[in-house]
């Protein structure tokens, strides 16, 4: 379950004379343990909301919790519970090949186990043949699948 309690998110002015932008005000929201979709127009705040869920952005006031874990107090734990894929997966794929990206995502495992587990995950998802290809040689859909595998790892 994800809960937002009295959440405000205010972006301070960028330039002198600008006003602060209020993005969220007094938001109270509870999402139960189901898969959800966040939809809306470009620039409507979907990514900002998701970043609040996994601690990539902190609210100006209020609390965000995931399965009872406060995002501000336990960011590492929350990031293990909440993941999302960017529209452009290149924004989150940091390494040169899928196997390297997935190995990086498995940092919670002992170092000796990571590469083998990464290959296993790719194989289980029908992506094993892409393991050592350049990220830039993959199609957009293949990049999305690799990004999803990294998030689920």
Listing of model-derived features with the role each one plays in the protein:
Residues 112-130:
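Conserved ABC ATPase "signature" region
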Residues 39-41:
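The feature captures the beta-strand-to-loop junction immediately N-terminal to the Walker
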Residues 148:
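Hydrophobic anchor residue at the start of the ABC signature
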Residues 134-138, 142:
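Conserved ABC ATPase signature
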Residues 1-4, 9-26, 32, 74-75, ...:
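A short, flexible loop at the N-terminus of ABC-type nucleotide-binding domains that lies
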Residues 54:
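Helix-to-loop junction immediately C-terminal to a conserved catalytic motif
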Residues 62-72, 78:
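Conserved ABC transporter NBD signature motif
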